[in-house]
Amino acid sequence: MDNDFILVLDLGGPQAVEMARKLRNQRYYTEIMSRGADEELFRRKAPRGILVVGGDGYSEPFPKAALALGVPVLALGGAARRMIETCGAVSEGILLKEQASQITFKPCPLFDQLSESDRYFARVDGFALPEGFVSIATTLEGFSPAYADLERRLYGLQFYAESNDPDGAVILSNFAEKICGCTPIWTAKDFLEEEVRYIRERVGNGSALMAVSGGVDSTTCALLMHRAIGERVTCVFVDTGLLRSGEAEQVRNTFEGELGLKLISVDAGDRMLNRLRGVIEPTEKRQVIYEEYMKILAEVGREHPEAEYFVEGTIYSDLLARGSSDAVYARRFDPGKRLEPIRMLFKDEVRILGELLGLPRALAARQSFPGPGLAVRCMGEVTESKLALLRRADAIFREEIQLAGQDKKLTRYFAILDDTRTVGRRLGVTTREYACVLRAVGEQGLASYTVGKLPYDMLERAAARIIREVPGINRVTYDISPCENTFVEWQ
């Protein structure tokens, strides 16, 4: 992409990912950088412009390295307040808080094609503007939620481009193209052609092993590698014993049958359960599973010394989550021999790429599944008997969701086995069995979720079937915890 891109500087919160994805959806390439980056890193990246977002609870000064580069800067939300203060503004206190107002845009490149709009403001502060800055918008109350130094191309808006916000999309597009000079050329098809060329140049006549789980990310990456180097990529599927009902067999059938890819399948269920014996804490579960998984991949690597490269289906959200850590690779391989072909793609872009590569539509729409599998949906110690209960309950819930036609409205839906035993009755006999929790969420915007509003009669059917068909579970609840206060997963 050379330097034809916007760098999104994340000061904290979910907005950075959402803004980056909005720009990508308009075909402008973006990369995200976390706060704390020094000026030298900014210069090496050499973006056309910088979008700074987040920081509503961020008390540190605005990153001066973003201002020192001399490229256009657009700061949104709390970042806009930090920027104007760093440039010498004096705060006059909070003028608006958590309310909607009409905003009138003044003529400037950022607001081209816009005149006025109704917006929600989490907070608007008043400022005595420093030299060079002018107000570029006013609210109905006469307050200024936006300002700019037009000569230095510094813009601050005390609001965000919201979900389903056409005016916000125009503002982002104006910044990228009319102010920064970026070209809207980012498409999955162009990425595919460019990445195939890169993989062929990098691997040459060599061969590779690729870790796959059967999910959208790793399957798409496997198809990409196969497009680039054909039979010289061999997929490695580790059946950890922590997958959903019938999933391991489905993965093997899909890769070897439907997709025609070379596959090594490793049955590691007993081995993984032995390592998990006595482990209760979620963090420790994840660590144990990760360590054992990587040991298995390293063993497979040693059994196939002809494979010079190790490939992972890492996507951009994985990259952002792990930060500067560079430890996610099989130990048999030199880090320089690791490939992560789709590491700069968001999940929705991976699905689009997958369809271009011939990924079956049903698999492209497959819901996300946590890396540690059912271990993080099984509260307390993970045992074979508890996993069996969870698989059966989960399969029933998923079946009822699909029968009710709710699957197209939801992003994720699954069962959780609580470690609590409750009093119940089965065939007239008092029981003390496990409680099961059902969870369903839909996507709201690009980086947030909302609780699934499922039909009550459907929930009743699912609960009745689980209690009737799964001895060992005598209570079913539905988790309606709001997603702004809780994670989608329980662990």
Where are these regions (language model features)?
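RNA-binding accessory domains that recognize and position tRNA/RNA substrates
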Residues: M1-V52, D56-F62, L67-L69, E85-E308, ...
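Gly/Ala-rich beta-loop-alpha elbow adjacent to hydrolase catalytic centers
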Residues: A75, A79, I84
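Extended catalytic-interface subdomain
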Residues: E312-T314
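Short loop/turn segments at secondary-structure transitions that flank enzyme active sites
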Residues: Y316-D318, Q444
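Short, solvent-exposed loop/turn and secondary-structure capping segments
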Residues: R322-G323
